[in-house]
Regions:
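Active-site-adjacent beta-strand/loop module that shapes the phosphate/pyrophosphate-binding cleft
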Residues: 81-117, 129
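Conserved Nudix-box catalytic region and its N-terminal flanking loop in Nudix hydrolases
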Residues: 25-73
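A short coil-to-beta-strand element that immediately follows conserved catalytic motifs
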Residues: 71-83
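NUDIX/MutT-family hydrolases
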Residues: 106-150
Length: 171
């Protein structure tokens, strides 16, 4: 009688460092996607580093492509140079090594010229919507994601002021 040998790959834990990418248009329409494992949980693109030495911009571009089908290299990906540290929800801690309860998240923005077609990864997300930034901030399940969307409006206004001042047009 032949025995059946099964091989289980060892559990690969998530690295507790991630990115959040607010995808938006110049007129501040924001793309939100709904998680497949949590109906009603709307969010921006998020994801963890695949390796400790993976550059953050590479992680951001990879996650955008995986979750939406959008190729970040075709548009303007900006590192917001903003980092937060938050407690990992208890229901998701099993994805991390024992004792890991906090995650460091780096914020990025991806500006597309208009709402672009989205191809969702059905195992991760079930629906998407382009919303005005205020409505998007209200829809976000996570308070930190909502804050990132609210910062988008501030960053856009600050960027316009910087460009005006640099051009010598300020009065």
């Amino acid at each position: 009688m032949l025995g059946v040998c099964s091989y289980r790959r060892p559990m690969r834990y998530k690295i507790p460092e991630s990115v959040l990418v607010v995808i938006h248009t110049p007129d501040l329409q924001v793309l939100l996607i709904e998680r497949a494992d949590r109906p009603g949980f709307w969010q921006s693109v998020t994801g963890s580093l695949d390796a400790d030495d993976e550059p953050l911009a590479v992680t951001a571009a990879r996650e955008v492509a995986e979750e939406t089908g959008i190729l970040a290299a075709s548009f303007e990906l900006t590192d917001w140079q903003h980092t937060i540290d938050y407690e990992i929800y208890p229901q998701w801690r099993h994805r991390y090594a024992a004792g890991i309860t906090r995650n460091t998240e780096h914020w990025f923005g991806l500006c597309v010229p208009e709402p672009v077609p989205v191809t969702l990864a059905p195992r991760e997300h079930t629906r998407f919507e382009w919303l005005p930034w205020q409505a998007a901030a209200e829809r976000c399940f996570s308070s930190s994601n909502a804050e990132a969307v609210r910062q988008l409006a501030w960053r856009t206004q600050a960027g316009q002021l910087d460009r005006t001042l640099a051009g010598g047009v300020a009065r």
